[in-house]
Regions:
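Internal amphipathic helical hairpin motif
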Residues: 4-58
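Switch/connector loops and helix/strand junctions flanking conserved nucleotide-binding motifs
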Residues: 8-12, 142, 237-240
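Short hinge/gating elements
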Residues: 10-18, 54-57, 183-190, 217, ...
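Buried hydrophobic packing residues in well-ordered domains
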Residues: 31-32, 75, 120, 145, ...
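Small-residue (GG/TT-enriched) beta-loop-alpha framework at ligand/catalytic clefts
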Residues: 53-161
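Glycine-rich phosphate-binding/hydrolytic loop that grips phosphoryl groups
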Residues: 91-94, 139, 235, 242, ...
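Phosphate-binding glycine-rich/basic clefts of nucleotide- and phosphate-handling proteins
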Residues: 124-219, 223-227, 232
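Glycine-rich phosphate-binding loops at beta-strand->alpha-helix junctions
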Residues: 219-247, 253
Length: 301
């Protein structure tokens, strides 16, 4: 699957009546045309019915069909065969279902911190219920922290230093031993990152509490998500998972760790299978050699 911010995919969730489901596509096209001035011939659309939610029509659309088609053809000409492209919420749902992350019948929350946005996706019973996003991503932190060292270090060097700082030191209320280049103010960076991440958490809480499917839940002791998962470039900021855990009040798992572990298990399984085949082949040849030797001995006698 492929995705690009330049495709400008959008998600919308509509309420439909049972009598309209027979001509669902026409209903969707008409509504998108009225609401967003979308021309169906120049747009990419996918939709599905979700009977577990009041807003049961889940629609993903983009008006950048020509750009998407051009990128597809470029990949094909390069010898690659993309399967599909879609929005971040749909990709997260596919990952959620593929890795069987459903733990119970409760709501699961998937948070994807991209370069320029953070996407928040609500899933229940493997069905996508709602999604929201706000305009804070990894670049939000990098651009602001880079200004701290811009007077003493070259631009690319500053950004590289900020990357290192975010990944290895990250969000912390206490000072750590800092081993980076001279000219980058660690103490100022730590305080700024704490302030920026606090702004991010406030927007995240607002987004979650504005889901229409569930009542405002942040800070309520009687509510717990069935699972909370984070991914994306911004999830590599050290202690970001802990900050989200403290904000939401539920344990947080990293999608990168889950996908890597799953891949390693499959790889180990293949390796074990090959090893067993090899061992069985050696054992077979050993028995066969013994039998051949015994036959020769019998002939000699």
């Amino acid at each position: 699957a492929i995705h690009s911010d330049s495709y400008q995919y959008q998600m919308t969730y509509l309420k439909t009546e049972d009598k309209l489901k027979g001509d669902f596509k026409k209903f969707i096209v008409n509504n998108l045309s009225k609401l967003y001035s979308i021309e169906s011939d120049n747009s990419m659309m996918e939709f599905e019915i979700n009977n577990t939610n009041d807003k049961n029509a889940i629609v993903c659309y983009s008006s950048k069909k020509s750009d998407i088609d051009q990128d597809y053809q470029t990949l094909i000409d390069s010898g690659l065969q993309p399967r599909y492209n879609t929005s971040i919420p749909k990709l997260l749902q596919n990952i959620y279902n593929y890795y069987n992350l459903e733990k119970n019948d409760g709501y699961s929350l998937l948070i994807y911190i991209d370069q320029f946005k953070t996407h928040i996706v609500l899933i229940q019973k493997n069905q996508l219920l709602e999604s929201r996003y706000f305009h804070i991503g990894l670049n939000y932190f990098i651009n602001r922290l880079s200004k701290l060292g811009s007077g003493t270090l070259p631009t690319e060097e500053v950004r590289s230093t900020v990357f290192h700082f975010l990944e290895n030191y990250g969000i912390s209320k206490t000072k750590n031993k800092f081993e980076l280049q001279d000219g980058f103010p660690y103490d100022d960076a730590r305080l700024m990152l704490n302030e920026l991440s606090s702004i991010m958490m406030n927007q995240m809480k607002d987004s979650i509490n504005n889901f229409s499917t569930i009542q405002p839940v942040i800070g309520k002791n009687d509510f717990a998500f069935g699972g909370v998962y984070i991914g994306g470039p911004g999830s590599h900021i050290k202690n970001m998972d802990r900050l989200i855990r403290d904000t939401i009040g539920d344990p947080v798992e990293n999608l990168n760790s889950i996908t890597t572990t799953s891949f390693k298990k499959r790889l180990d399984s293949k390796m074990n299978f090959r090893t067993r085949v090899k061992e069985n082949y050696i054992l077979y040849n050993k028995k066969r050699s013994k039998n051949n030797l015994k036959n020769v001995q019998n002939k000699i006698q």
